[in-house]
Structure formats: C-alpha cells, structure tokens
Amino acid sequence: MNGTVSRRRTAVRTALASLTATALLAGCGAEVEPSGSGVQKVTVNRCGEPVEYTTPRRAVVYEGGSADKMFALGLTEHVHGYVMPPANPPVTESPWAAEYAKVKFLSDDLLNRELLVEAKADFVVAGWNSGLSDKRGTSPEILDGLGIQSFMHAESCFNYPNHPERHAPFDGLYTDLERLGQIFGVQQRAATVVADMKRRVEAVRAQAPSTRTPVFLYDSGTDQPFTAGRQVPPNDIISFAGGRNIFADLDGRWTQVGWEAVVQARPEVIIILDYQDQPAAQKIRFLKTSPKTKNLPAVVNDRFFVLDYNEGISSPRNVDGLEKFAAYLRDLRS
C-alpha cells in the first residue's frame, strides 16, 4: 500500500505575525523560534521524535492523501508539486481538483531521492514505506542530510523502525493536520478543519447500529488477499459506520491473509478498494467466479461497497468514505 507565499509586510506587521504565531504554537505544545526573515522555526514530533522544522517553501507531496491534507489546510501556495502513482484515481475527481491544477505534476512513479533533488524540494509529505523508505533513498535520515525536511503520516509510524508511534487511524489523521498546522503556522485553521471532521464522525457514530455487520475489505490479490488490519483507516471506517472488520484482531496495517480465514468469517459485506490500475469491477468479477469466494454471503447477496483509494488511505477524504459507507449499511437495514 500499498506552498510558498512570499508576502511583503511592514516590519511592524511581521513582528506582530511572529508574536501571534508564537502564542498559538505555545498553546499547541510546540516550541517555536521566530525568525527575522519571516521564516518560522518550530519543533514538532515526527513519529515520536522531536524535529525542528523551518517553514517550507517548496513542498513535494506523495499520493492523494498527502496532497489533500495540505490542500485542506489552505497550503496550496506552499506546494511545489505532487507525485501520483498509477494506483491513485485521476486528480480531476478529487474535491481539491482546482488546487491540483495550481501545482506541478512531477511524476507517476514512486517517490525517489533524485526526483526530490531535481525539484529542489525543501519538504516532503508521505508515509513510511509509502513514499519514504531506505530502499529508494528517501528515509528521513537520508533526506535530512540533503537538507530536505520530511513529514510522515502518523498512521504509518506504526511500521517506522526508528521512532515508532501508535495512533488509531482517524486519530492519526487529526494529528497530521494539527502538526502540519504547527509547521506552517496555521494552527487555528487546522483546529477548525479537525473540529469539523470530528463533528461529522460523531454524527455517523451516533447512528451506528448496536449489531455489527461482519465486513471484509478486499484490497487486492488472488492467491492470497491483501486486506486491512486495525492500524489503517478502513478499520475505523468499518467500525464507526456500524460494521465489524473481520480482521480487526490483526495488529497491523495492510496485510496478507488466507482465503480460508475469509471464508470462515463469512462476511456479509465486502468493501472493494478501488485502484486506478486495479478497477473495482475486475475484483468483483474475481470474487463472483472464484470457487473460494463465490459462496460467501456478501457475494451471494451482491453486497459490495466500492471505496475510493483516496478514501481508504490516510486522507481528509476518510471522513467522506465513512459517511458513504455508513449510509450504505443503513440502506441495507432499511
């Protein structure tokens, strides 16, 4: 699982802005060091490790979830460009399509060190083993040595070997928005965005039935299915909507299981994670024709819910996915 606003201010306004940012950051528990150049330095946790960030000017974002977090906070002018592998749906389908149009498309390949250096990036937003990795020369340590700051999705810190940090998936989303708000000095905006998300989530949870529907998330795979453990957003989407992830007992993120375990759990609903390069229709066709799965209750009753890829990875769109899936479950019960 698989930006720069150069504003001319008077000296007085710059000083006032720095003081305001300092006060806001202090209230969020971050340490800030004002700079006379209009650039702010702030210490924020990165997977449990205190890291000093300087206000980024040329951010590169990897996949839709990273871009959407920046756009949701109104930080488009700080984004130089985006890297979007083939699994991601077209950016024209995003709620932030207009923001994508304002920044550069850099590549449809995996994130790599050469791309970041060529883009003259000073900041990258990605997940551990989803953009950031030792293998591709994009670990935080390597990027630090190149003068490129890195921000890891809190949800992905579960797998980060150096400074692991655990967050429930939706809590990780809120944490990311709050931390990005600190780094870019838009804490109040982040607080407003997070508060609205929490309000929407609680509205869904208030309507969730007490009887939980067993749900299987099908990511990919035919010999062995790839699915969601309890450390990724679909687990919270299923739970908050009134379902029960049949693999919620797996303390992991995206993981392989055996078809025998799926058959034994007898899911009544199957969520299909819809990749651009692995369409949902193709996966549904496999489930309906495979001897291993064609007799599952969800398959027999044609109970498939298609979850957009960017609603399934850590992203502000997780809440959209939750609302849609909750409505689907309510319709099944009506």
Can you annotate each of these PLM segments?
Residues 112-123, 141, 146, 257-266:
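Short helices/loops that flank or line small-molecule/ion binding pockets
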Residues 90, 227-254:
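Alpha-helical, coiled-coil/dimerization segments enriched in small aliphatic residues
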